[in-house]
């Protein structure tokens, strides 16, 4: 966002991440503050934390959500299940979301390469009448290549299903099962790893992304 001309300040707790922010060029007292002070100064508060951290930090954020501000999320969990998380925003602010379909690291890398990562967006609450404009501007600002509309609830459930079901669940389970099966049948750790993780991540997935599964099946040697 800073590279795209937005006036960005960072709110960060003291610790290793705070020190990393300083090393990355954020200046204490100018562009780097405590979470409380950053929320007080900001007109758009971007809550870019894990689900558990959002819940723990919410009491610090909420008092600074004054009328006309925008509360921005990159994931719909806290709002979708706010009866359990306790994250209930005041009615006189905008509540918006842009959810990149990938990691923050991927988003940054693609931006530096001149590419964009697809993102979904949603508006939960439009108190100012400008929530849509704010959302689209921020979506472009973070480096989205394409934006498609969703809701907080749909984003939260699809993200959890994808990550816990396939992306962080099934894939890891399949790779581990194949690796262990090969090892049980006498294959070396190197061979088992290369026939499992290495071939998938370094060879097949780039082809899958570029050409699709029909091409993969048509060109499979086995």
Spans of model-derived segments:
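Short glycine/serine/threonine-rich phosphate/pyrophosphate-binding segments
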Residues: 1, 16-19, 54-57, 105-107
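NAD(P)+-binding Rossmann beta1-loop-alpha1 motif at the extreme N-terminus of oxidoreductases
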Residues: 1-29
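Class I S-adenosyl-L-methionine
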Residues: 2, 19-22, 136, 140, ...
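Residue-level detector of anion-binding/catalytic polar loops
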Residues: 7, 27, 44, 145, ...
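Rossmann-like NAD(P)-binding element
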Residues: 13, 24-80, 88-103
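Small-residue helix-packing motif on alpha-helices
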Residues: 18, 38, 54, 189-193
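Rossmann-fold dinucleotide-binding core
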Residues: 72-164
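Helical "substrate-binding/catalytic lid" subdomain
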Residues: 141, 147-222
């Amino acid at each position: 966002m800073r590279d795209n001309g937005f006036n960005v300040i960072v709110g960060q707790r003291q610790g290793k991440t705070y020190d990393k922010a300083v090393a990355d060029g954020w200046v204490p007292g100018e562009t780097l503050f405590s979470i409380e002070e950053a929320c007080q100064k900001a007109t758009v508060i971007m809550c870019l934390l894990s689900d558990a951290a959002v819940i723990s930090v919410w009491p610090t954020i909420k008092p600074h959500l004054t009328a006309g501000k925008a509360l921005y999320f990159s994931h719909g969990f806290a709002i979708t299940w706010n009866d359990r998380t306790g994250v209930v925003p005041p009615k006189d602010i905008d509540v918006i979301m842009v959810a990149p379909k990938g990691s923050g690291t991927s988003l940054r890398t693609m931006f530096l390469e001149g590419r964009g990562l697809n993102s979904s967006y949603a508006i939960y609450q439009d108190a100012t009448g400008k929530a849509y404009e704010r959302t689209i501007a921020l979506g472009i600002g973070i480096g989205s290549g394409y934006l498609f509309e969703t809701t907080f609830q749909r984003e939260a459930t699809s993200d959890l299903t994808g990550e816990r079901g396939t992306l962080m669940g099934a894939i890891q389970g399949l790779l581990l099962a194949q690796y262990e099966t090969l090892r049980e049948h006498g294959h070396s750790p190197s061979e088992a790893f290369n026939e499992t993780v290495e071939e998938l991540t370094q060879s097949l997935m780039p082809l899958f992304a570029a050409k699709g599964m029909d091409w993969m099946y048509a060109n499979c040697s086995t």
